[in-house]
UniProtKB/Swiss-Prot annotation:
It holds the Pfam family RNA_binding. Belongs to the UPF0201 family. The lineage of its organism: Archaea, Thermoproteota, Thermoprotei, Desulfurococcales, Desulfurococcaceae. InterPro entries: PAB1135-like, Ribosomal_uL5_dom_sf. It comes from Aeropyrum pernix (strain ATCC 700893 / DSM 11879 / JCM 9820 / NBRC 100138 / K1). This is UPF0201 protein APE_1751.
Length: 150
């Protein structure tokens, strides 16, 4: 199991704007993802929340919300657009929606007034991760449900 965990890396990043409260940005992130570690980095005048995890279990909330909100098709499309090679994908979520426990996919930081939450998933087979998080659907219902990839 430990060898598998080291092949998985999840990085969550969200800018903390000067008018924002760090705790609210952290809440927005934790409403969607459960990182194992969180830190705040200062890059020039910009502060960024960085969360990291080495297990897909940290995406369990995202998995559940996608089903509760019935947005598997939109999520699958956003995830497929974010694929970078066989082992990496990045998605962007609207920060204010995440704060309220909702999901809204955006294509860039500019679509979220306070900046987006960027989630980068590295896994040996990122397509398996997509199939687990957002399987294909027929009439809004998943064609299959996969177990969490290792």
């Amino acid at each position: 199991m430990e060898g598998t965990r080291s092949r998985v890396r999840i990085t969550v990043e969200a800018e903390v704007r000067p008018t924002e409260d760090r705790e609210k940005v952290l809440k927005a992130v934790r409403n969607v993802v459960e990182p194992e570690s969180v830190r705040f980095e200062k890059i020039g005048s910009t502060e960024i929340l960085v969360g990291e995890s080495s297990t897909l279990a940290s995406l369990s909330r995202l998995h559940s919300i996608l089903r509760a909100e019935r947005i598997l098709d939109a999520a699958r499309g956003a995830m497929k657009k974010g694929v970078q090679g066989a082992d990496r994908m990045t998605i962007h979520l609207h920060k204010q929606a995440a704060y309220k426990g909702r999901l809204s996919f955006v294509s860039s930081d500019h679509e979220s007034p306070m900046g987006a939450i960027r989630i980068t998933i590295e896994h040996p087979n990122v397509r398996e991760v997509i199939d687990w998080l957002a399987p294909p659907t027929v009439r809004g219902r998943p064609v299959f449900e996969r177990r969490m990839p290792e």
